[in-house]
């Protein structure tokens, strides 16, 4: 299967001119530039009509500098902000407070926290596993305790077979074979999905399974709609029976919302088999296309009860998206 053939497993994309006219990038970038220009114009107008505002801005920058020094924050982030404010006092201060305000994100965080709490009710460590660790390896027991009592509350599992793939090239055949064996559902969540040979082979199976009545869901980061996928890709997936969502899609509004991206790479099949790791769904990850030389990213295949955690992670994100 060639890259050109695999990219056409879904209905043909719009023509070149239609794509240019309907591309979401154009209006989104235009609106963002207009918003930025409005903010700059408003600021310059204030300076012109109220010269004393400059003094207050510098005083605010000094206050912000000391506020940063006493704030609980990663030292590298703190240093970065200090440098920005030192070089660009007014712009840096405004940018910091805009970032801290997290406009448009608080409701998302609340929904994610609530969904995580609900998911944790279904995930718990088997007491026998904890007893086994306490008797076999104290170091592993401490690590397990840390994971179980972390904010995410990851349970510990024992009866799970793990297969390591040193390359995406090694992972793909196994993934395709497991997808073909699916009987109930397939959940896929990826940071990058790019049309090509890899996605074409996966998509052919997903479409077949969806027609057979399986629950097939695909979720990708919203930035894909600006980079690798067409603006109507979710609708095109729906037409072939695949449920699809984009996490944090880019909209024509200035917001720190866009800092929150979904970098997960997860496939869950029937709650029994799962894949995760660093391999996205794009041809360079399986060396079907050379982009930056020979591409190396690793992946894991899980077969057993530990898959339940990955299933919960997927459904949690699916619920809040």
Language-model regions, residue ranges each:
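N-terminal localization/anchoring segments of enzymes in phospholipid and broader phosphate metabolism
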Residues: 1-321
């Amino acid at each position: 299967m060639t890259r050109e053939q695999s990219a056409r497993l879904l209905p043909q994309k719009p023509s070149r001119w239609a794509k240019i006219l309907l591309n979401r990038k154009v209006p989104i970038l235009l609106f963002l530039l207009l918003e930025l220009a409005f903010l700059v114009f408003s600021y310059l107008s204030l300076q012109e009509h109220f010269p004393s505002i400059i003094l207050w801005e510098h005083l605010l920058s000094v206050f912000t500098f000391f506020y940063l020094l006493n704030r609980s924050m990663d030292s590298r982030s703190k240093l970065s902000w200090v440098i920005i404010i030192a070089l660009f006092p007014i712009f840096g201060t405004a940018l910091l407070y805009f970032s801290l305000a997290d406009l448009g994100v608080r409701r998302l965080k609340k929904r994610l926290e609530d969904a995580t709490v609900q998911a944790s009710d279904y995930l718990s460590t088997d007491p026998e596993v904890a007893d086994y660790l306490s008797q076999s390896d104290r170091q592993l027991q401490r690590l397990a305790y840390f994971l179980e009592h972390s904010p995410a509350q990851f349970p510990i599992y024992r009866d799970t077979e793990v297969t390591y793939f040193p390359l995406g090239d090694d992972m793909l055949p196994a993934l395709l074979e497991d997808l073909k064996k699916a009987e109930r559902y397939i959940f896929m969540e990826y940071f990058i999905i790019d049309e090509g040979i890899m996605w074409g082979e996966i998509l052919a199976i997903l479409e077949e399974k969806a027609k057979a009545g399986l629950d097939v869901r695909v979720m990708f980061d919203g930035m894909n709609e600006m980079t690798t996928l067409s603006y109507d890709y979710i609708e095109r997936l729906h037409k072939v029976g695949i449920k699809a969502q984009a996490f944090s899609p880019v909209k024509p509004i200035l917001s720190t919302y866009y800092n929150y991206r979904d970098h997960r790479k997860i496939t869950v099949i029937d709650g029994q088999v799962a894949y995760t790791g660093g391999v996205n769904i794009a041809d360079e990850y399986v060396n079907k296309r050379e982009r930056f030389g020979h591409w190396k990213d690793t992946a894991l295949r899980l077969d057993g009860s530990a898959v339940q955690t990955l299933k919960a992670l997927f459904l949690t994100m699916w619920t809040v998206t």
